[in-house]
Design a protein with these regions (language model features):
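Conserved N-terminal beta1-alpha1 strand-loop-helix module at the mouth
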Residues: 2-51
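Short, well-ordered coil/turn segments that N-cap beta-strands
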Residues: 16-20, 48-51, 77-81, 106-108, ...
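Conserved, mostly hydrophobic/aromatic
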Residues: 24, 52, 102, 192, ...
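Catalytic beta/alpha-barrel core
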Residues: 51-62, 85, 111-113, 198-207, ...
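Active-site-adjacent beta->alpha loops and helix N-cap segments on the catalytic face
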Residues: 10, 32-34, 60-72, 91-97, ...
Length: 327
């Protein structure tokens, strides 16, 4: 399908404005990846996202790179970073130290996650005194913030001016890794909200009805926080299969087959852009407050999707630009 498919053009510029736009990036794991990573960030910044989340790595193994990446985003870019925090791979002391470090660096938003267990440790449980769930992690983050505010009046004022926000994960299709159904995940989200979660970002799904049904069920039981759909560009069948193996969320076979049948990556990119723009259009029609795009540190697939929706990069915008509202 051509990129000029008008049936799905520019929903963000109609009744849905203002919508939230955000990206997930993974910190570079070695020095040779630093330059391409920051080039990708710069390209993403040109479409004026509201925030950018930085992963922490399975088992917390990328924690030092994540901390350095988040600090640089705070210091050198106009973006509001969301710092991922996980229970797996971290003692309580390490989590507390990381929260203090992030808060001291100017971070005001966290994504509290249980995290993926290390390979071969699928039955992971926290050690004595460890943090075992996203709910416990929310409590810990807010406890650290309170201690800082109690100890320093200036921090209390800053907190009043820019309140701490904590995002959590939501699983519209259920969580195969935890063996939970969508209904059970709604109840889990309600518990996270009660613990102090500010908003939720969903795990992957491939049908807007999955998202819409989850949100409807969540609202019926009292979940009031925003639920932002998390979406992955469908341009690489091998990557989709790896993500399926990691998350347990089944990728529709027609999607994998269609991508595999295209002889060139250019055609797969075009198909993925149209598929992604249609999915975004559908979730916005269902009332989504915006979209969170999983980039895998590749700017082109997400920018292709956004271009179909009328979101164009600003060629003059740089990392040092001032924040501004998307037109």
């Amino acid at each position: 399908m051509p990129f000029s498919d008008d049936a799905y053009a520019c929903p963000c510029t109609h009744d849905h404005e203002p919508t939230l736009l955000s990206f997930e990036v993974m910190p570079p794991r070695k020095p040779s990846l630093e330059e391409p990573f920051w080039n990708t960030v710069d390209q993403l910044l040109r479409v004026r996202p509201d925030f950018m989340s930085v992963t922490y790595g399975a088992g917390g193994k990328d924690r030092s790179n994540a901390r350095a990446t988040v600090r640089r985003l705070v210091r050198d870019t106009p973006i509001q970073p969301i710092a991922h925090l996980t229970c797996v791979g971290n003692s309580t002391e390490e989590v507390v130290s990381t929260v203090y470090d992030y808060l001291d660096s100017g971070v005001r938003t966290f994504l509290a996650l249980r995290g993926d267990p290390p390979v071969g440790q699928e039955g992971w449980e926290p050690g004595p005194g460890g943090v075992g769930s996203a709910t416990e992690l929310i409590h810990l983050i807010r406890t650290v913030e309170k201690r800082r505010c109690d100890a320093h009046p200036g921090e209390a004022l800053r907190s009043a001016f820019k309140p701490l926000t904590i995002a959590v994960a939501a699983f519209p299709a259920g969580n195969p890794a935890a063996g939970t159904t969508p209904a059970q995940e709604v109840e889990r989200l309600l518990v996270k909200q009660a613990a102090g979660a500010s908003f939720a970002i969903t795990q992957l799904f491939w049908d807007a009805e999955v998202y819409a049904s989850f949100v409807e069920r969540a609202r019926r039981v009292g979940v009031t926080i925003p639920i932002v759909p998390g979406l992955l560009p469908a341009t690489d069948p091998a990557r989709l299969r790896r993500v399926q193996d990691l998350t347990g969320i089944e990728v529709p076979e027609y999607l994998l087959t269609t991508l595999a049948d295209y002889p060139h990556q250019e055609a797969r990119d075009e198909f993925g852009a149209v598929f992604g723009s249609r999915l975004i259009h559908s979730v916005l029609e269902a009332g989504a407050p915006g979209v969170h795009l999983y980039t895998f540190n590749r700017s082109k697939p997400v920018l292709d999707i956004l271009a179909l929706m009328g979101v164009k990069p600003d060629p003059l915008r740089s990392q040092a630009s001032s924040p501004e509202t998307r037109a």
